[in-house]
Structure formats: structure tokens, C-alpha cells
Amino acid sequence: MICVEIWSNRPDFCKMLEPLHPLLRQAFDPERFLRLGQQVLQDAFQHLQDSQEKKRERSMPWTAPEEERRFWEERLSAPEGLVPLLNLVSERSNRLQDPRYMGHQVAVPFPDGALVGLITDLLNNGGAVYEMGPTNSAMEDVLMARIGQMLGLPAGCGGILCHGGTLANLVALLAARRSAGKEGVDVWSDGDDGLGAVLVSEQAHYCVDRAVRIMGWGTEGVGLVETDDRHRMTRAGMEKAMLAMEKKGRRVTAVVGSSCTTSSGAFDNLEWVADFAAQHGLWFHVDGAHGAPAAFSERHKHLLSGMERADSVAMDFHKIMGIPALCTGLFFRGQEMSFLPFTQSAEYLWSDAEDPEWWNFGKRTFECTKRMLSTRVAAVLEEYGPEIWGVLVDRLFGLGQALAELIVQRSKAGWQLAMEPEGNIVCFRYLPGDFTDTEAENAFTSNLRQKHLEQGPQYIVQTRFNGKVWLRCTLMNPLTEAEDMAALLDRLEVLAQEVQR
């Protein structure tokens, strides 16, 4: 009664509601959307064609950070509209579709992915609870179980899709921490003593170290395992690191195998890691962000022998699986294990916070709202089947071996290969003439890479390990050919002469 009296004295908001603003009408006009879409798609086609045919001067249009910021400071002060903006972004961005782009570990996406993004961005369904995105929630659960078995995990496996391998590795280690909790103690609810630890290769991606620190275990919570001359963890190194952690009073909960390392592309012997984990009662996690797709290749799946014994596996669909960033799968050998990392009350979202409802992904993910990632994965399987991942891996890994062969053929001229590549990451350097010491070699290599960055036309990066600076190629584009890689070496030889002057 009181509520009725209050509302009876309020203004008539329905009559006061203003007509739809012209800007909003314009923004939501379907016919305008169609016109813009046709133009944008035509421009995207031209960008794709020009990139594949190497029509632009450089695959990476380098500008210094401050120069690029000044450009956008001015440009964004004078808006010209959506189509001109998108064309300018395309013009000034890295051309991953150009076969001369051989830099970072980011997929050259199947062009179909842009069409998938068009629809999923328009639908914009979330995924914290089933009601926000029923289609992508159901597809995600089906796909994670099926693909997990393709990776060799047992029936009953499952997992989640998330935005990036860094997040996937963190969530996996949160599961490991909770799994290793003492009887009657729930670390999610009560915290822990801060004395946990994780063993990981000294060559592993820094995100594992970061995850351990986020969990509150600090620098001492990371047990770095020594590697051999091919950057693979050794059995003796794992035992040594375990003993060192125990002497510090640390409680090791997990060991992480790298498949493969970011800097050099080394694959840990996962059979050794699995044996070690079983011997010591540890959670066995595989950081397969880059290399786990080798499971789809008959030619290269031996690199992952032992992964089928893992408790959890992280795999980026946005690296060598042709899917736009970000899209990562975190697989658990048992679907029930995917509920370990998070349990908390959120009654307004689901009826029972402790009930393992697979359809409410907010119970299993760090993220609440996330993009419709499952549609990206499903689209590839619908159009090509999982076979395309196998042939893509074979092609990219084959390019890595071909580049290594080209480098070895020029070894007498000063070319050095860091190690024979197992995948599509190749580290090398060019040292013409005599250098006084390692410092001089490193300076020359860095200067050569900087000059190449500025002048192109290819794009590569550099890395450092064992005190030496190396040039580094990640062959991500299946359209790259042997002549493109030979042209890269030729170009570096020309630029080296300028550096030596």
C-alpha cells in the first residue's frame, strides 16, 4: 500500500521519455550496418590479398613508440569515420598474413575467423552462467571433452576456454594448490602458510613464475630445474630442485613440463616429468601453449609422449591452430578437477554455489564475462575438421627444419644455429669476421636485429639464453616458402655490412 502511494505521487516517466536520439538510431540501423559491412569486407579482402602477395614494402611497418603515439594523438583528434579508421589501422599494423612476417608466436588466423568474430561480436553472449550464453556454454563443454581426448587425455576429461595461456597456467596451479591441501584445510577459504612451491624449467615462460607469486608463494616458491644443452629439463635437475625446495622448508605441489619453451622451442621429456610427478605425488601440469597442437600430427606427436598422463594441460588455439587471439584451452584429466580452483558463494548467479553445474562456467573460470570462444573453435572443426591442425603443424614445423637447413648450409660464412629445432621456433645468429668476446658478438647481433627491424622487409625478433643473444624466427605462416627464408638470410647479410662500417 505504501509503495502504491509513493508511485502515485511520482511523475509519469513513460510520457516524459524522450524519442530515440538520432545517433542511437544511426548506430543500430541494420541497413547502414550492411553497407558498412560490405565495404569493410571488401577492404579486408584487399588487405589479405596484398599481404599474401607481399605487395607492401614491409611486413612490419616499424615506427618508434613515441612517433606512433604522436601520430595517433593527432589522428584521433580529427575523426573521419569507421571505414577510414579501419583502413588506417590495417595500414599501420603488423601484417601477419604476409609470408615475410616471421616474428612472434601469434597465429596467422584462418580468414574465416574474421567472419566468426563478426557474428559472435554482434551476438555478444557472455558465459558466466548458462542463461547468459546457452549456446557457447554447451558447445564449450562438448568441445573441451572431445579435444581433450584428441590430446590423449582419458574419457571423462574436460576443461574450460579462457583468454590466454598465462591465465590458463595460473588456474591450473590454483587447482594443484587446492588438490595438495592438508586434510580438513581448504586453502581457497582459509589461505595457506605461503610455503608452497612449483618446479619448472629454468627456460620456461615467465608466466609460471608470475602465477606462483600471485598465489603468494614469492620468489622462493619457484624451483628452477636445470636443463641440458637442448634446454630440456633433466631427471637429475628435477631431483636436485626438489631437494633444494625441501631444504628450504618448501612444500612442492606441482611440476610443470614445457611443450615447448618460448625462447628456443624446446620440448621437455614429458615421460620423465610424469614419472617424477608420480614418484613424488605431485600435480603434473603441461604448459603446451605453443606446442601441444603437435598431438594432431602423426609426424610430430612423439614430442608430447607422456602428456596423456598430465593432470592438466594448457593449449593456445591462437598460436599454431589458426584461431584469432585470445583463445586458450585448459584441459583437466577429469572434468571434476576443473572445479578445484574456485568455489565461492554467488547465489544471485546460480542456485547452489557448491553444486558442480558444468553449464555455469563462472564456477570454473577466473573470468566472468568472456567472449564466445567455443564458436571460434567449432567453426574450424565444422569447416575443415581436426585434420587441418595436423597439416598446419606439419607445415610450420617443416618450415622450421627448412630454415635450419638453410642456416647450416651457410655455416662457413659465419652463420650459427643455436640448436636443431624440434618445431617452428629457430634461433640463430650471423657473425661475419672475428669478434673479441661474447659481449661484442651480442652487441653486433642486437644492432643487426635493430637495423633489420627498422628497414625490413621481413620481421624477426631476438632472444637471449646462456649469456648469448640470438636472432629468433617463429614460422607461423603456412604460405611462407623456402625462398622467403633464403631472402631473409640474404637481407641480413647485406645489413650486416652496414652494421660493421
Give the positions of each predicted feature:
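Short loop-beta-helix segment that forms the pyridoxal 5′-phosphate
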Residues: 147-174, 223-226
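Conserved PLP-binding catalytic core of the aspartate aminotransferase-like
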Residues: 417-451
